[in-house]
C-alpha cells in the first residue's frame, strides 16, 4: 500500500507485485481515494449557501495528476457555475510548521487588505492550514467575526480540537483502509494461483466524503 509520492505508478507497476495507491498518482496501478471533487463541491456549495461575498481556496500548487487536484478543480468549477466571485491561492509551501505559518500569514494579510468589508468564505486544503488561518483571525480580532467562514478538509483531530471547532470535509478513513485491503488481498490471492491472471486494467475506487458542520460556518 503506497501513500508516498516517491515512485511514479508506472515504475510501481513494472515490479509486478500487488500494490494499491491511496491518494497518490495511480495511472498504472489500482487505487483508493476520497472523492476529492465531491468533497470540494460540498465545501464550496456550503460557503455559497451561506452567502459569502468572495470565496477563496488556499492550497499548495498541486500536480494535476494527483487526486487532490480535484479539490482545486471542483472549487473553481462550482464558483463559475454559480457566478460567485472567487480567488485561488496556490502559494502555500514550506518544510516546517513555521515556514507554512509564515506563508499562511502572508495570505491572511493579503485577504484582509483586499477584502476588508466583504464576507469571506475560506476553503483550505486541509485542517492544519484551516487551524493556522483560524488562529491568525483570533490573534487579530480576539473572536471569530461574521465576515469570515472557514472550511477545512480531512477531519483530522485538529479540526475538532481547535479554539473554535472547524467545519471540514471528513474522509472515511476506515472505509478507505478496508477497500484498499480488499483490493490488495484480491491481487495477492490471484498471484497464488498456478496460472495467475494479470489484472487487465487498474481498479480505481472513490470513497464519498462527509461534510461535518461545526462552528466556523453558519
What are these regions (language model features)?
Residues 89-100:
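Short beta->alpha junction loops
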Residues 43-89, 196-217:
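An alpha-beta-alpha
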Residues 32-57, 73, 77, 99-110, ...:
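Hydrophobic alpha-helical segments within soluble ligand-binding/sensing domains
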Amino acid at each position: 500500500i503506497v501513500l508516498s509520492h516517491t515512485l511514479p505508478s508506472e515504475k510501481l507497476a513494472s515490479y509486478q507485485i500487488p500494490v494499491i495507491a491511496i491518494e497518490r498518482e495511480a495511472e498504472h496501478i489500482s487505487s483508493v481515494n476520497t472523492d476529492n471533487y465531491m468533497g470540494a463541491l460540498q465545501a464550496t456549495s456550503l460557503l455559497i449557501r451561506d452567502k459569502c461575498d468572495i470565496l477563496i481556496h488556499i492550497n499548495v500548487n498541486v500536480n494535476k495528476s494527483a487526486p487532490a487536484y480535484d479539490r482545486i478543480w471542483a472549487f473553481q468549477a462550482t464558483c463559475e457555475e454559480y457566478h460567485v466571485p472567487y480567488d485561488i491561492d496556490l502559494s502555500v509551501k514550506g518544510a516546517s510548521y513555521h515556514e507554512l505559518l509564515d506563508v499562511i500569514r502572508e495570505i491572511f494579510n493579503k485577504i484582509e487588505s483586499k477584502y476588508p468589508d466583504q464576507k469571506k468564505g475560506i476553503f483550505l486544503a486541509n485542517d492544519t492550514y484551516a487551524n493556522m488561518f483560524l488562529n491568525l483571525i483570533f490573534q487579530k480580532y480576539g473572536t471569530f467575526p461574521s465576515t469570515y467562514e472557514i472550511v477545512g478538509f480531512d477531519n483530522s483531530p485538529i479540526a475538532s480540537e481547535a479554539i473554535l471547532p472547524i467545519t471540514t470535509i471528513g474522509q472515511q478513513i476506515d472505509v478507505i483502509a478496508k477497500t484498499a485491503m480488499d483490493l490488495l488481498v484480491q491481487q495477492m490471492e490471484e498471484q497464488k494461483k498456478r496460472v495467475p491472471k494479470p489484472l487487465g486494467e487498474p481498479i480505481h475506487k472513490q470513497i464519498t466524503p462527509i461534510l461535518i458542520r461545526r462552528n466556523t460556518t453558519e
